[in-house]
Amino acid sequence: MRSASEDRTAIARIRDAAIEQWGRHGFNVGLRSVAEAAGVSAALVIHHFGSKEGLRKACDDHIAELVRESKTESMRSADPANWLAQVAEIEDYAPMMAYLVRSMQSGTDLAKSFWQRMIDNAEQYIEEGVEAGILKPSRDPKARARYLSMINGGGFLLYLQMHENPTDLRAVLRDYGEDMMLPALEMFTNGLMTDSTMYDAFLAQREQGIPFSHPSEGEGNDGSNSTVPAAD
C-alpha cells in the first residue's frame, strides 16, 4: 500500500511532468506520455486526477497559485534585492511560461477560466502593492488588473514569436528580462504622457455613459460604411 507521502510525491511528479510535456509539445500529448515522463503508470494518473481534463485543471491551479505567491511576495517587499533576485531566476520559469503560452493559444473554455483566475489574482496582488505603498491606487482596480494582465500576456506572446529561437524558452525569458524590464519600469514609474488631458477627456465621456466606439451620424450597425474591404 502506498503511503500518503508517496501519493503526494507522485501527484507532484505527474503534475510537473504534465506541465513540461504540454508546455513543450501542446495539449494533444496524451496521458500515457505524461505518465511515462513522470515514471508512473497511466492508471496511477487516472487514479489521482480522474481524466486528462482533471490533470490539466490541477496544472492550472498549481501555476495560478505559484504566480500569485510570487507576485504577492514582490508586492509586499520594498527591498530591491528581492526584486533583483526574482529576475535573476527568470529562466527557472521556462516550463511554466511554455505552459502559459500553450494555454493562451488553445482558446478553450478551460483556458479562458484559467486566465480569468489569473486576472482576478492580479487584482488581489496589485492591491497588496497599493496597501504596501509601492503602487498607486486606481479609480478602477479591476479594469487596471485586466489591462495589465492582457498586455503582459499578449506582449510576451508577441515577443516569443519575434525571438530568433522561440523554442528555447529559457533563452526567450532571459532576453525578455533584459529587453523589457527597464522600458516597462520607466513607463510605469514616470508615465508616458506629459499631462492628463487625454485621460480627462475619455474619463468625462465614460462618466456621461457615452461609448468610446459608436456609429457616426448616418451610419448603421451593419458595417456598410466600413473602410475595411469586404471579402470576395
Residue ranges and their predicted role:
Residues 149, 154-158:
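Outer-membrane beta-barrel translocator/channel fold
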Residues 58, 65-102, 106, 141, ...:
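Hydrophobic alpha-helical connector segments
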Residues 13, 17, 21-54, 58, ...:
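Helix-turn-helix
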Residues 87-123, 160-164:
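Amphipathic alpha-helical segments used for helix-helix packing
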Residues 67-71, 108-134, 143-146:
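Amphipathic alpha-helical packing segments from all-alpha helical-bundle domains
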Residues 2-13:
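Short, Lys/Arg-enriched anionic-surface-contact patches
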Residues 120, 124, 128-131, 157-232:
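C-terminal peripheral helix-coil segments that are non-catalytic and often amphipathic
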